[in-house]
């Protein structure tokens, strides 16, 4: 107890002495640094591009930043922590020779008089000319499948003859050219692929060089004894990229559908990008495979297994991410349409996944265009979540308003409007299917040029409601233009984006976004 009292007294005396201390200190101003003229990010091509940064440094003491008093160091730090020193000068002007990837670039300034150090940072992406941009697939003048890229690593540059120079055999019937998205972690990097999909074969290319071989055929990642795999061709992959960074609706699961109606599903955590038996059957032991329409329905922002269409029995089916087979779907009272279309006589014509949020479905609704035996057309809107799909709405197309709809060969659903664009007899139409307010708009924008592609952007800037339209004529070759659909619900207009218009292209059939990974 006596010991505790002594401690308490000592503590009180200490507090009092601190309170009475009015100080007798000498304060010295120190030099401070303010950085400027450094961008938020830089993109370079390895062993090619000069990285040039000339920062401004304002010193509070008025000292010149070029004085011998200061030491400089530019350090790149990779995502795994590896460090690379690029320069030891205030400004940097050098060709970057780093492994491909994303880095944090630090500028460190040390005052050799005071030993104080200041640091600022920016982001550096090191890639090849193929690192980022728009992937195009279509036909060349000989009618063969060909691919191009609008590289956007620095200034936009058109790269042609990608397939011709890839090492792959000559291909026919272009379908798609896609990047599967940025991996969740480096352990998933093996599952990241650039796919070339054509009617004569599906192959993946090296992401850095765009080179491929016949050994990169889809059959090399399929492990099933139920069907021969040598001639299989991919026509759709889910999930796909949902933003310019390369994010996808799931980093752990993926599905593919082939041209002959097989649906494969995998867990990349377990199998990487390898696939076992097709899941479009009714039990894990069944050898009876149901033919699937060549499209996978799913919410763009949240993939949890495929919803697919059984063309043999005309019904929508589902499989979860862990399924080895598929499930039939049960209707609820007052549903806008039945999952089983066998009783309606309707068949699936076209499917599309969008960012439509009707019904509170923020991950995105899907659309199915149906046709019955009498030639009538219907739009089904659904939330195609693999474990729990929901129906959102159904609309019959008024063919008295939708001119030449039965002749349509291309379709595109707006995410933000009740509007279906279509091309019939080389004319572009927009049909507003809002019940009771149906309207039709025709756009004469392309003269005699052939319309070769119609597709909404769901990858680069989905919120813009941008429609990409490709055309072709023998004189000026292929052209791709980005149009923005207006928001006014009373009218449909298209505004062309002069900064996003490219010509001298192949006959474009499809496009997608290539992110930086």
Language model region names:
Residues 2-9:
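Sec-dependent signal peptide recognition
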Residues 19-162, 166, 459-464, 472-517:
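Acidic/polar, low-complexity intrinsically disordered N-terminal segments immediately downstream
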Residues 374-478:
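Intrinsically disordered, low-complexity segments enriched in Gly and acidic/Ser/Thr residues
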Residues 131-132, 191-192, 251-253, 363-366, ...:
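Short coil/turn segments that connect the beta-strands within blades of beta-propeller domains
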Residues 147, 177-178, 186, 408-413, ...:
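Hydrophobic core register within WD40 beta-propeller blades
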Residues 135-140, 197-200, 257-260, 369-372, ...:
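Recurrent small/Gly-Pro-centered beta-turn motifs in extracellular repeat architectures
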Residues 14-17:
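C-terminal motif of bacterial Sec signal peptides marking the signal peptidase cleavage site
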Residues 157, 162-166, 178, 182, ...:
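Preference for solvent-exposed, low-hydrophobicity sequence contexts
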